[in-house]
Amino acid sequence: MAACTAAQQLLLVLSALGLLAAGAPQPPNIVLLLMDDMGWGDLGVNGEPSRETPNLDRMAAEGMLFPSFYSANPLCSPSRAALLTGRLPIRNGFYTTNAHARNAYTPQEIMGGIPNSEHLLPELLKKAGYTNKIVGKWHLGHRPQFHPLKHGFDEWFGSPNCHFGPYDNKAKPNIPVYRDWEMVGRFYEEFPINRKTGEANLTQLYTQEALDFIQTQHARQSPFFLYWAIDATHAPVYASRQFLGTSLRGRYGDAVREIDDSVGKILSLLQNLGISKNTFVFFTSDNGAALISAPNEGGSNGPFLCGKQTTFEGGMREPAIAWWPGHIAAGQVSHQLGSIMDLFTTSLSLAGLKPPSDRVIDGLDLLPTMLKGQMMDRPIFYYRGNTLMAVTLGQYKAHLWTWTNSWEEFTQGTDFCPGQNVSGVTTHTQEEHTELPLIFHLGRDPGERFPLSFHSDEYQDALSRTTQVVQEHQKSLVPGQPQLNVCNQAVMNWAPPGCEKLGKCLTPPESVPEKCFWAH
């Protein structure tokens, strides 16, 4: 039998989901809510004692909670690249080979970005007639060839980099904010952030962008993909005036409360427009909470060890909620091992599209889990740069390498695991365990404090199964061309498109490409 066309595949999916109506089929809208440095333990539904996330808790009560959902990397840029490609960063190029097991991302001086050879989710969704918008942080490269509107998005309001600053526009420029193809200002200038008080109106702007886009696409009767990637919970944390000082958790809690309020507005609009049953919404975060910034500017990873920058559970296990009234039964909890890469494949399935067949796709289609409660065996791989640090299979997690950061950094105050030191586990030298991995049973020991005895039958059984999975993975792995090796002061945001109209072009320094330095 001939392969199904995209249209035939869509008809089959919509028929199975009960979404066919008179006239042409309309695939479900897709809304992905990606937070920045938000921890697993920041949601009331996950046990945060202040219970300051009523809308997210309601979202979970009306949908499906995933307690075992993971990012693809303990850092922002590689995780976002994995979400939009469905592929591990080691495959899509979002890693560095400048040093062993180093986290890398896309600061202003990076020369690399998302390769044209990668197929991004919005590019593929266009084939099914979707209109695509990104709101917030892109972080997959800021040079012209990496612009999100060149990679499938139709609209953009947000920034190419994180909201670090303010800078003097001499040694380093302030980060631009874009409206579609051109900048419309810069952070700390046209888009102020008060570093002393934490006041900024950005979340309100990002929320209104989302609401306006939904209303416009509903009026057009056009299926839409909204990628809402806001960064209020990334240090320096910010919140708007009406939320500052309202949380029991300090400024970080203020930001979480505002995000929760915004999520409530988005879900309410979908319901008021009568399109909630035809809109799939998923909430998660790019990596674990940055404990180094806690408590005032960092979140909670609940019972899990360490945080952002590490491949312990606190660095990569994320809050995750799926919401789709009328399709995902209310009040469900799934212990399926999920990954941020699954959002790529699941979204394609919703649109009636198959993932690309010319490359390895790491993301799974979670619709069978969400709609029918099916469980799938799959490993979770924990990479740090070019190094496979750990793997989880079922309840067992095997550490092939352990490292938090160097003793030098640690003694100078950089601590990714404050108050959580575990002897022989949270090491400050790179320790190899590939012959005899440290293995933990995450069901009994979610904090990774008590490794199984090497001599136990349980260890030997877990080792046998884990070793097979790792060997199969590494045997077939073809790493992508590393994108995060070369830096250059001349490629920073000196003169973004549109700067001429605003009189905000800056003169770049001489181009001097050099190897990026990644400390940890």
UniProtKB/Swiss-Prot annotation:
3-oxoalanine (Cys) PTM sites in chain numbering: C76
Disulfide bridges in this chain: C306-C417, C487-C516, C499-C505
Protein name per Swiss-Prot or TrEMBL: N-acetylgalactosamine-6-sulfatase
Classification via CDD domains: GALNS (cd16157)
Family designation: Belongs to the sulfatase family.
Upper classification of the organism: Eukaryota, Metazoa, Chordata, Craniata, Vertebrata
PROSITE patterns: SULFATASE_1
Pfam families, per the entry: Sulfatase, Sulfatase_C
Gene3D superfamilies: 3.30.1120.10, Alkaline Phosphatase, subunit A
